Design a protein with these regions (language model features):
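Bacterial N-terminal signal peptides that target proteins for export
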Residues: 1-7
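Bacterial N-terminal signal peptides
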Residues: 7-16
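N-terminal helix-cap/turn-to-beta initiation motif at the start of protein domains
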Residues: 20-29
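Compositionally biased, proline/threonine/alanine/serine-rich low-complexity intrinsically disordered stretches
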Residues: 21, 154-195
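Structural motif
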Residues: 31, 53, 126-128
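Central antiparallel beta-sheet cores of small beta-barrel/beta-sandwich binding domains
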Residues: 34, 40-119, 159, 183-195
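Surface-exposed interaction patches
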Residues: 100-151
Length: 195
């Protein structure tokens, strides 16, 4: 009887010790870079956990090569986002986390004000994020792969004040970045960030 009891007790300590030693799985919290299919960086986003769901806010835009300056307000948006400044605008809303997958959310295209269903999936190492916007069913949509940026990509003082919001949780300690500090792509200059 005693050997079985001690074996069970040792197993319990072993399992508990392994669970306590496992690092937390990464989340989408933090900075992300979005690029188009040609590799031109379009924007940086900041994800936070708010009221139990994740949202992503626009924190930096880049001028596309050969295009005019990026739009400054969401003139085609509806509701409380109508004519809101682009910097700090919530583009992705209501994302519920289930492991590395996020769903039940929406994504806004600020160019035309259209809101699409959205789902996301975080790579196991936490450095890539597949973002899919769709109409009706996920099969009818488009996916972009975003890249995680270092936590110090933008100093907190330089973030649009709307980016964090009053009840946003600070991002957890991120997974270690595998790249050096990210600079704007060659030939692109970031616009001045309003304070």
């Amino acid at each position: 009887m005693k050997p079985a009891f001690f074996a069970a007790l040792a197993s319990a300590f072993l399992v508990t010790g392994q669970a306590m030693a496992a690092p937390p799985s990464p989340t989408v919290s933090g900075f992300w870079q979005q690029a188009d299919d040609d590799g031109h960086v379009g924007a940086w986003f900041y994800f936070v956990l708010r009221d139990g769901v994740y949202e992503g806010r626009l924190v930096k835009m880049f001028k596309p090569p050969g295009d005019e300056a990026p739009i400054s307000t969401c003139s085609k948006c509806e509701g409380d986002q109508k004519d809101a400044p682009m910097m700090g605008l919530t583009i992705i809303k209501g994302m519920h986390r289930n492991g590395t997958k996020y769903d039940e959310g929406s994504i806004l295209d600020p160019r035309d004000g259209t809101v699409y269903h959205a789902q996301m999936e975080l790579a196991p190492d936490g450095q890539k994020l597949s973002v899919r916007g769709y109409v009706g069913v996920p099969l009818l949509g488009k996916t972009q792969v975003w890249t995680r940026l270092p936590d110090d990509a933008i100093a907190p003082a330089d973030l649009p004040k709307e980016s964090l919001g009053p009840d946003a949780a600070p991002p957890p300690t991120p997974a270690p970045a595998k790249t050096a500090a990210v600079k704007p792509p060659k030939g692109q200059k970031p616009p001045a960030i309003p304070k």
